[in-house]
């Protein structure tokens, strides 16, 4: 682990939750998607605030407006403190992005719905490996691998 990553992890976990996510949590989802509810419950528990859920039949337009690359699409898009989180992004990765605000990054995404990612946990099912991808005007890069 690089010193920068270690420092970012320490900062992310040492900060009070309220300082990490000062603004409201807004989540647009495909209407009626149950895994989005599971993910929102985890966000609520970890950030200590309600998640405003919007059933959005026109979510692709919302995603495009937020700069989410089409190939990174999932079933929900959340906004916290101006950062976009597409799909089943783990809470620890969200906290790290919110604490460090990586230069040129406007959001994080987990493409699709990988088994075992937050909200997609199912007893007896094998966890699939997946990447959390940081995206922004300058392109994209892997932010974390799970």
PLM regions with names:
Residues 32, 39, 55-58, 90-94:
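Stable alpha-helical elements in mature extracytoplasmic
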Residues 21-45:
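Local sequence-structure signature of Cys/Sec-based thiol-disulfide redox active-site neighborhoods
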Residues 8-18:
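Bacterial N-terminal signal peptides
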């Amino acid at each position: 682990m690089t010193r920068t990553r270690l420092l970012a992890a320490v900062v992310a976990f040492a900060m009070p939750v309220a300082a990490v996510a000062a603004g409201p949590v807004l989540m647009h989802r495909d209407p009626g998607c149950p895994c989005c509810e599971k993910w929102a419950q985890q966000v609520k528990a970890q950030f200590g605030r309600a998640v405003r859920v919007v059933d959005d039949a026109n979510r692709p337009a919302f995603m495009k407006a937020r700069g989410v690359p089409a190939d990174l699409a999932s079933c929900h898009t959340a906004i916290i403190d101006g950062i976009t989180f597409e799909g089943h992004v783990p809470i620890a990765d969200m906290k790290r992005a919110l604490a460090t605000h990586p230069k040129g990054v406007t959001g994080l995404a987990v493409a699709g719905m990988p088994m075992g990612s937050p909200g997609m946990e199912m007893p007896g099912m094998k966890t699939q490996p997946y990447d959390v991808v940081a995206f922004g005007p300058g392109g994209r890069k892997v932010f974390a691998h799970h």
